[in-house]
Swiss-Prot record:
The N-terminus of alternagin is blocked. Ca(2+) 2 binds at D70, P71, E73, D85, V86. This is Zinc metalloproteinase-disintegrin-like alternagin. Expressed by the venom gland. Ca(2+) 1 binds at V6, N9, L11, E13, E16, D19. It comes from Bothrops alternatus (Urutu). Signal peptide: none annotated. GO terms for cellular component: extracellular region; plasma membrane.
Length: 196
């Protein structure tokens, strides 16, 4: 059962141009609370590209860039809504060729992924640590297939479990790994990482 639209419930429903609540409570200068239609001369009532009841000027940024792979979006000047969030194509080089774009991010090995798991003084381990990913067991693998660990090919050893070097005085662990019983993928190299 679909209930009919109700003007004044602060929900934008079919047939309404705006809905700012009851006439007593409406705080939107662009909207006629009694009819849920825009007032005369108003182009819009709300949204990221609506300012003082008019569409925001074309080219005005409405969504900031979150990374090199996620460009900022801008108002079109023809709509109250911000343009759809788009990313650079997956596989496009980023961060001076250290990584590839993947779903709007630029995941790289180096310090960032180890830091996120373990904190300061932890860096990407030596290449020799990653060779364990060829074993295809609980400690080293590339991916899971039917709950079984599948080994990495020699060329892909840096695409599986993430090995970090802990330089802190108490640890001094050259091949540190992260284990999680809640998330079996946590502790793996992030998807999309340039793992050469």
């Amino acid at each position: 059962i679909i209930s009919p639209p109700v003007c004044g419930n602060e929900l934008l429903e079919v047939g309404e141009e705006c809905d700012c609540g009851t006439p007593e409570n409406c705080q939107n200068x662009c909207c006629d609370a009694a009819t849920c239609k825009l007032k005369s001369g108003s182009q819009c009532g709300h949204x990221d590209c609506c300012e003082q009841c008019k569409f925001t000027k074309s080219g005005t940024e409405c969504r900031a860039s979150m990374s090199e792979c996620d460009p900022a979006e801008h108002c079109t000047g023809q709509s109250x809504x911000c343009x759809x969030d788009v990313f650079h194509k997956n596989g496009q080089p980023c961060l001076d060729n250290y990584g590839y774009c993947y779903n709007g991010n630029c995941p790289i090995m180096y310090h960032a992924q180890c830091y996120a798991l373990f904190g300061a003084d932890v860096y990407e381990a030596e290449d020799s640590c990653f060779k364990d990913n060829q074993k295809g067991n609980y400690y080293g693998y590339c991916r899971k297939e039917n709950x079984x660990x599948x080994x990495c090919x020699x060329x892909d050893v840096k695409c599986g479990r993430l090995y970090c070097k802990d330089n802190s005085p108490k640890q001094n662990n050259p091949c540190k790994m992260f284990y999680s019983n809640d998330d079996e993928h946590k502790g793996n190299v992030l998807p999309g990482t340039k793992c050469e």
